[in-house]
C-alpha cells in the first residue's frame, strides 16, 4: 500500500501578520494546501492521503476540501503533532487503526506549503523507497555553502559539488521509519527533527531523488510572491 502524508501543522510565524496559517493562504485565488492536495490526487497509486493539521483547523480543512470538491474518499484529515516527526507518527497511527502494516507499505511525506511538486518527483520517490527503504528529494546547491561555529567567522567551506538542498517529499517504508523513530531516546527525538536524518544517524541508506528549483517551500511573504510568479508561468506537473 502507498500512503501520502501531507504535513500542515505549521502556524506560519515567518509569514508575518496574516489571519491564517500559511498553508491556508491564497495562491492565485486558491489556498496553497488545495494546490498541494490536487497534485497528490493526480498520482493515482495512492491508497490514502492523510493531512495532519492543528486540531482547531481540522474543520476548516474539511470545509476547504468540500468547497473545492476534493472530498475524495481516500482523503483523511487528522490532528498533527507538536513537531514534524510527531505529525508523521500520528499519520502512521491513523493508518494502523484500520490496517496492519507490512514491510513494503510506503508513506510519501510532504510539506503542505510546497504546492509545485511534480508527478515525476512523486513517482521516483515511490520507486526508490520500494528499493532502498528511504528517499529524500534534493536539488544541487547553487551557492557556495559557508559553515560557522560562532556566527562570526568561517569555520569551513564544504565542497559545493557534494552539497544539496533538501526539499520534500521524503518517502519511507513505514515500518522501518516507525521502528527507527521509536528506537530514539527523548533527547534524540528533540534533536533529530528531520525524518531522513534519523535514518542517516542510525546508519541506514537514504536514496536521493532529484527535485526541482521551483519546488519551493512557501514560508515568507517573499516566497509567496515567488510562488505567484511560478504559478502564472504555468509550470508543468511532469
UniProtKB/Swiss-Prot annotation:
Q: Drop me one GO molecular function for this one.
A: 2-C-methyl-D-erythritol 4-phosphate cytidylyltransferase activity
Q: Please state the Enzyme Commission number of this protein.
A: 2.7.7.40
Record field: catalytic activity: D-ribitol 5-phosphate + CTP + H(+) = CDP-L-ribitol + diphosphate
Which keywords are on file for this protein?
Answer: Cell wall biogenesis/degradation, Nucleotidyltransferase, Teichoic acid biosynthesis, Transferase
Q: Where is this site: Positions ribitol 5-phosphate for the nucleophilic attack?
A: 160, 217
Residue numbers marked as site, Transition state stabilizer? 14, 22
List the InterPro entries hit by this protein, alphabetically: IspD/TarI, IspD/TarI_cytidylyltransf_bact, ISPD_synthase_CS, Nucleotide-diphossugar_trans, TarI
Q: Which residues form a coiled coil?
A: none
Q: Which residues are involved in binding CTP? A: 7-10, 81-87
- A Pfam family (short name) is IspD
PROSITE patterns given in the database record: ISPD
* Metabolic or biological pathway, per its Swiss-Prot or TrEMBL entry: Cell wall biogenesis; poly(ribitol phosphate) teichoic acid biosynthesis
Name the family: Belongs to the IspD/TarI cytidylyltransferase family. TarI subfamily.
Instruction: State the HAMAP family in the record.
Output: TarI
Give the protein's function.
Answer: Catalyzes the transfer of the cytidylyl group of CTP to D-ribitol 5-phosphate.
- Protein name in the entry: Ribitol-5-phosphate cytidylyltransferase
Taxonomic source organism: Staphylococcus epidermidis (strain ATCC 12228 / FDA PCI 1200)
